[in-house]
Amino acid sequence: MKVLWAALLVTFLAGCQAKVEQPVEPETEPELRQQAEGQSGQPWELALGRFWDYLRWVQTLSEQVQEELLSPQVTQELTTLMDETMKELKAYKSELEEQLSPVAEETRARLSKELQAAQARLGADMEDVRSRLVQYRSEVQAMLGQSTEELRARLASHLRKLRKRLLRDADDLQKRLARLGPLVEQGRVRAATVGSLASQPLQERAQAKLRARMEEMGSRTRDRLDEVKEQVAEVRAKLEEQAQQISLQAEAFQARLKSWFEPLVEDMQRQWAGLVEKVQAAVGASTAPVPSDNH
């Protein structure tokens, strides 16, 4: 990836520092293309490389530069490459944010904000390049038929400055993305841990859950039995106490009844005995022999 960036930087410097009419050395292009193909960077980096390659091609135009810049083809091509670069960058940013999902929300939001700002700066730089070319095309149209050497020099100067800004902002964005590496790895480890837990056999997890549930129910049942035993013992003690009180009350009532009825019974016994004696006396008198008149 770093080799690709270096190759593109060398290419861009060569295009900016050389005169516009100067042809490109034939040995440089195959070497740079081979280095670019040998390094498989992120899609957004490759798209940015294509943007730089096209800009370099525009700068190395010779006699045809006025004709090409007078048509909207260059700006249209640059707009397409800009859109492609930003699209790839947004996709890569979204992929990183998905991998950062296990990270703390505050950290993820801060990193996302930083990446978005760097992405906006890079997009603004590319838009500035396109605007400069549009402005140059307008000035060339106004000076049609006149010498455009001064305009070309101004354009080359502007593009050199813009190249530095592009390089700085792209390098800043790349560094910020590189700082996400440890966090992405941390998110992958957490995701792998969760995945290993989720890959346990369903039966094993169900049995573990059932055992935990049975242990909980057994503990609750034992607690309930102990509570019932305490309640039964308490009720038994109360019943025994009440039975003892009833027994004492019955004995006291029996004693009171006895004290009430004993005098009556004794009086009735005496009266009965006297009545029996009277009856016996009457019966004895009636059975005595009557004296005869013949004597």
Curated annotation (Swiss-Prot):
Sequence repeats lie at residues 80-101, 102-123, 124-145, 146-167, 193-211, 212-233. Residues 256-268 are annotated as: Specificity for association with VLDL. GO terms for molecular function: cholesterol transfer activity; heparan sulfate proteoglycan binding; heparin binding; identical protein binding; low-density lipoprotein particle receptor binding; phosphatidylcholine-sterol O-acyltransferase activator activity; phospholipid binding. Keywords: Chylomicron, Endosome, Extracellular matrix, HDL, Heparin-binding, Lipid transport, Lipid-binding, Oxidation, Phosphoprotein, Repeat, Secreted, Signal, Transport, VLDL. The keyword Repeat applies. Residues 158-168 are annotated as: LDL and other lipoprotein receptors binding. Heparin binds at L162, R163, K164, R165. Residues 80-233 are annotated as: 6 X 22 AA approximate tandem repeats. Pfam families: Apolipoprotein (PF01442). This is Apolipoprotein E. Residues 244-295 are annotated as: Homooligomerization. Its main location: secreted. GO terms for biological process: acylglycerol homeostasis; cholesterol efflux; cholesterol metabolic process; chylomicron remnant clearance; high-density lipoprotein particle assembly; intermediate-density lipoprotein particle clearance; lipoprotein biosynthetic process; melanosome organization. It comes from Macaca mulatta (Rhesus macaque).
